Amino acid sequence: MLLEPIITSLLETDMYKFSMGQCIYHQFSDYKTTWSFKCRNTDVHFTHEMVEEIKEQIKAYCGLRFTEEELEYLHKIKWMKGSYVDFLRLWQPRYEDYEITEDAECGLTIETFGTWLNTSLYEIPTLAIVNEVYFRMAYDYDDLLASFEKKLDEKITLLKNSTYNLGLFSEFGLRRRLSAGAQELAVKKLNENKYPGSTFVGTSNVFLAKKYGITPVGTMAHEWIMCVGQGNHKHNPAYSNWYALDWWVKEYGILNGTALTDAITTDCFLRDFQLTYATLFSGVRHDSGDPFEWGEKMIRHSESLGIDPKTKTLLFSDSLDFERADKIASYFAGRVKIAFGIGTYISNDTDVPALNIVMKTTKCNGMDVAKISDTPGKGMCKNPEYVEYLQRCISWRMENDR
């Protein structure tokens, strides 16, 4: 291993991996999933040396275990149950679940195979490893870090002088961060400063949330809706949201209540997000499509159900920077609660372009699963026939299910 270990704690993942993980443990522990890595940058190539370093870093990650101090921290989270904490006490990543080759056009193929309970937890650390190895080995890292620090200080100044007023915002950048050190620096500086029109709430990185005594932020991801709704082959996949919301409420009741809307289009989501769920959930998250149109749609939906939109939160997390977040916050001011999850712009803004890398669920229980979001091209299913089938199911429901 050429570099120091990149992942040094099993807490170094996004919070929603634990909230989903607890549901998976209690309700879907026998589900099997396949996850596939993709680099969307067309001009990026991973060298043989990079791939070998990625393998060694993942092996080091697979040697980690939760400490009792970390487990105690998790157990104090109000929705975390002792049975899941006891499972995590025994849990360890398995390198045997990984298949890493150089077959892809970008020079790096990664797939993981195993229980959903295990493979779900691999996604975020794997992406963080790939990202940091690439930037440390492809560029002069010290120069990148210097440009990162300069841009970070400029961003903080823009918040302090009220050029941008975001209201509530959190850092969501673990998976595509420049490095562990860069992300920690960003979280530390954002947390220690005060802003007239913005409040830094926390981070999705549970390790950093614990270290700095701030809120670990996150509820559910697309994988939850895709696997719960499409992993049982007796289900009509156009009702994926209903199944996912139903099982979530069975686990958490009114806790952990931010629903993701765009796994199989927001319009289809709203067919299932009726009075019971719209009342129980504290808000919804935007991750694709036009944020202004989406926000208006959410407000109209709440009003149609007799719910005051001002009692609900719209969480925006799609490709945000401070300027875009400021415009959204200003547009919806006084009409609904607003919050932001901001990722790469905080954790990897340097003088070179960031990587656009993802790792997505591509199979569940031996069958294809897919996301059809509000932005074309964000899905990653390997079987176009399944995507066509899913789209037909959604279209039929939207046209016929009144």
Q: Where would I find each of the regions flagged by the language model?
A:
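Glycine-rich phosphate/ribose-binding loops and adjacent secondary-structure elements
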Residues: 2-3, 212-402
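Ordered alpha/beta subdomains of enzyme catalytic regions
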Residues: 1-238, 358-402
